Amino acid sequence: MSESRQGYKRHGARYKARRRAVDILFEAESRDVDPVAIIDDRKTLSNAVDPVVAPVAEYTEAIINGVAVELDTIDDLLSEHIADTWLLERLPSVDRAVLRVACWEMLYNPDVPVTTAVVEAVEIASQYSTDKAGAYINATLDNMASKVDELRERAANPGAVSGSDAPVAPWDDSEELPAEDEAEDSRP
């Protein structure tokens, strides 16, 4: 390999779709809007006569729609498997987005090998987040990967994952969260 290509990694269409899905989930949480609405806006803008944004890949749309539909289950399972010293809500938004994309792929997309979902998530986190993000994202997803069949079964059964303590999506205005001083929180 030539010297100029050392360190160069090829990234296929799915990697780019995952990365765009992370961008959109991050934006949705930051702006407090529905990520599916962002997809719709991007599709409209990309279909204009003089497009101002790149077209949305089908796989990006599948990820966003899947995460939006399964968000409560995904967040419940992530909360169960994240390190005891962390709360999902307290992680940086970009890390939550990366974890949600990878979790959706692991549980709901049998076409993606679990190892691929984990490796790609760690790589995206290393590009977008802090130096330490890759390690705890890898640990969380490896923990989930070790029992992926059980988790897929739980995810397929709506009653198998507790929904009562599930965090409300930032774009879901149907429920009001308690004020910060009213919320019970025993972990950092």
Curated annotation (Swiss-Prot):
One of its GO terms (biological process) is transcription antitermination. One of its GO terms (cellular component) is cytosol. The keyword Transcription regulation applies. InterPro entries: NusB-like_sf, NusB_fam, NusB_RsmB_TIM44. Residues 154-188 are annotated as: Disordered. Residues 172-188 have a biased composition (Acidic residues). Pfam families: NusB. Keywords: RNA-binding, Transcription, Transcription antitermination, Transcription regulation. GO terms for molecular function: RNA binding. HAMAP family: NusB. Involved in transcription antitermination. Required for transcription of ribosomal RNA (rRNA) genes. Binds specifically to the boxA antiterminator sequence of the ribosomal RNA (rrn) operons. Belongs to the NusB family. This is Transcription antitermination protein NusB. It comes from Corynebacterium efficiens (strain DSM 44549 / YS-314 / AJ 12310 / JCM 11189 / NBRC 100395).
